[in-house]
């Protein structure tokens, strides 16, 4: 199953775009030469995330996460905490969520 998220050209060169995803939200962004999709949820307390200076930061308590690995880098999140990435592919100029891959 594939679900179109956005056009590849909609994804900024820096920062992210936040999009609806089946009643929730995802960040779509560029990292390490590819497009990534991460759930817009802080694993510390479930708050939203903001993209700041190459990191995702929770405005509720200040937990921060590396955009490349998804690992917690600061704040109250457990040091072994990691963001949830979604499987995605760029096909024919579209960024698609790909279920089951």
Regions flagged by a language model, labelled:
Residues 1-55, 66-67, 80-101:
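N-terminal pre-ligand scaffold of iron-sulfur
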Residues 56-62, 72-81:
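Short cysteine/histidine-rich metal-coordination sites, predominantly Zn2+-binding motifs
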